[in-house]
């Protein structure tokens, strides 16, 4: 009986899942590498702090492997055509030792298809500014 109920719910959920995934386009993936003048553990803590401050949803947190993948979702009231409607997908890899680390990042923006066609520069600028703020927390400027 339970199996039949489970099979009946799948067709009902499938259209909802497909509707949630359509209508989006992704920008190009951009990668970078930066030295961090701190230990690998400190770089990890700084990266998590920066992502939390930027309201990213953390998907994968692997402190032993030094991996973080995250997505910043738009707010429910974001208007298409504004930077608030852009999603930012980010993957970080932190490698190193107690005396220094390397921060590798890979990111892209994701936006509604109509916005990706007409105003891709808005999302690209938002992605760049967001990554610059994260970079400033992980690798603070020298005083």
Model-predicted regions and their roles:
Residues 22-143:
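Ser/Thr-rich, low-complexity intrinsically disordered terminal regions
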Residues 1-13:
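Bacterial N-terminal signal peptides that target proteins for export
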């Amino acid at each position: 009986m339970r199996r039949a109920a489970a099979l009946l719910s799948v067709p009902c959920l499938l259209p909802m899942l497909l509707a949630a995934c359509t209508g989006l386009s992704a920008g190009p993936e951009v990668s970078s590498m930066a030295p961090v003048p701190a230990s690998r553990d400190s770089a990890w803590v700084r990266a998590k702090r920066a992502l939390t401050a930027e309201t990213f949803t953390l998907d994968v947190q692997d402190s032993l492997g030094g991996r973080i993948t995250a997505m910043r979702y738009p707010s429910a009231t974001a208007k298409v055509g504004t930077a608030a409607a852009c999603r930012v997908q980010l993957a970080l890899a932190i490698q190193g030792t107690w005396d220094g680390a390397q921060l590798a990042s890979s990111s892209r923006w994701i936006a509604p298809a109509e916005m990706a066609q007409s105003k891709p520069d808005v999302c690209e600028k938002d992605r760049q500014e967001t990554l610059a703020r994260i970079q400033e927390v992980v690798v603070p400027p020298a005083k």
